[in-house]
Amino acid sequence: MSRLKEKYLNEVSPALMSKFGYKSVMQLPKVEKIVINMGVGDAVQNSKALDAAVEELTIITGQKPVVTKAKKSIAGFRLREGMPIGAKVTLRGERMYEFLDKLISISLPRVRDFRGVSKKAFDGRGNYTLGVKEQLIFPEIDYDKVSKVRGMDIVIVTTANSDEEARELLTQFGMPFQK
């Protein structure tokens, strides 16, 4: 069992039960899944860019990403419907906890001038969205092999009913929010 999962069961659950006064363990908010999306705009001209992005996501998450395709044609971007323009991974279960642990304890502190993640990035339904400007914050990525610095969106989906509950859950996990 991963470190964060154990922490959730032994420390976070009792703390949340007492703070929000839940009657049942089933009411507890928990992390459902983590979706990591990488948009590769230059895949339109250069198809190798997408392969590099897919490989990087595979290295970071330990799971093969799905290639996302354009839903609509946009002439201004020279984009046709069905063209591959990105990659995404949905992590659940053990891999999800491993990734979250790695993100909180190793990757986020490696961001330059890091002062904590925004408190305002909750969506009102208890999900948290985080933008990462470069893939180099992950220790698995080799700096010399990177052709282009790419960012990604990381969405942490929780079963919490409100932003307050989700914020408390992530704070208990050790997510470094801004003061």
Curated annotation (Swiss-Prot):
One Pfam family, short name: Ribosomal_L5_C
Entry annotated with the keyword Ribonucleoprotein: yes
Keyword tags: Ribonucleoprotein, Ribosomal protein, RNA-binding, rRNA-binding, tRNA-binding
Gene Ontology MF terms in the entry: rRNA binding; structural constituent of ribosome; tRNA binding
GO CC terms, sorted: ribonucleoprotein complex; ribosome
ATP-binding keyword on record: no
GO terms, biological process: translation
UniProt xrefs under InterPro entries: Ribosomal_uL5, Ribosomal_uL5_bac-type, Ribosomal_uL5_C, Ribosomal_uL5_CS, Ribosomal_uL5_dom_sf, Ribosomal_uL5_N
Gene3D superfamilies linked: 3.30.1440.10
Function: This is one of the proteins that bind and probably mediate the attachment of the 5S RNA into the large ribosomal subunit, where it forms part of the central protuberance. In the 70S ribosome it contacts protein S13 of the 30S subunit (bridge B1b), connecting the 2 subunits; this bridge is implicated in subunit movement. Contacts the P site tRNA; the 5S rRNA and some of its associated proteins might help stabilize positioning of ribosome-bound tRNAs.
PANTHER family: 60S RIBOSOMAL PROTEIN L11-RELATED (PTHR11994)
Similarity comment: family membership: Belongs to the universal ribosomal protein uL5 family.
Subunit-level organization: Part of the 50S ribosomal subunit; part of the 5S rRNA/L5/L18/L25 subcomplex. Contacts the 5S rRNA and the P site tRNA. Forms a bridge to the 30S subunit in the 70S ribosome.
Record's protein name: Large ribosomal subunit protein uL5
